[in-house]
């Protein structure tokens, strides 16, 4: 094999590894965004019910606390919301 062919193969492998890493990071961030949207919707729902009825919904509070107590999606990420 010529050095140019070896270099091309190595470059493709490196590009593939970088693509996998980037898409993994994108997926982790997307999951965080979806989780935060779900938490925001539950908070809004609790606020609406509190305004309407004068008390808060126990089921929504339990679901919200379960989401918040779930922990980190990525254990190496210490900047959690």
From Swiss-Prot:
Phosphoserine modification, residue list: 53, 57
Single GO molecular function: CD4 receptor binding
Presence of keyword Nucleus: no
Membrane topology designation: Single-pass type I membrane protein
TM region positions: 8-28
Annotated localization: Host membrane
Extracellular side: 1-7
Regulation of this protein's activity per its record: Ion channel activity is inhibited by hexamethylene amiloride in vitro.
Any further remark recorded for this protein: HIV-1 lineages are divided in three main groups, M (for Major), O (for Outlier), and N (for New, or Non-M, Non-O). The vast majority of strains found worldwide belong to the group M. Group O seems to be endemic to and largely confined to Cameroon and neighboring countries in West Central Africa, where these viruses represent a small minority of HIV-1 strains. The group N is represented by a limited number of isolates from Cameroonian persons. The group M is further subdivided in 9 clades or subtypes (A to D, F to H, J and K).
Domains (record comment): The N-terminus and transmembrane domains are required for self-oligomerization and proper virion budding, whereas the cytoplasmic domain is required for CD4 degradation. The cytoplasmic domain is composed of 2 amphipathic alpha helix that form a U-shape.
Stated family: Belongs to the HIV-1 VPU protein family.
Protein name as catalogued: Protein Vpu
Species, as recorded: Human immunodeficiency virus type 1 group M subtype B (isolate JRCSF) (HIV-1)
């Amino acid at each position: 094999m010529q050095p140019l062919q070896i270099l091309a193969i190595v470059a493709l492998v490196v590009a593939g590894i970088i693509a996998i890493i980037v898409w993994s990071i994108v997926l982790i961030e997307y999951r965080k965004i979806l989780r935060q949207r779900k938490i925001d919707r539950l908070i809004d729902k609790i606020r609406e019910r509190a305004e309407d009825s004068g008390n808060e919904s126990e089921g929504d509070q339990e679901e919200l606390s379960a989401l918040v107590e779930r922990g980190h999606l990525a254990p190496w990420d210490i900047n959690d919301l």
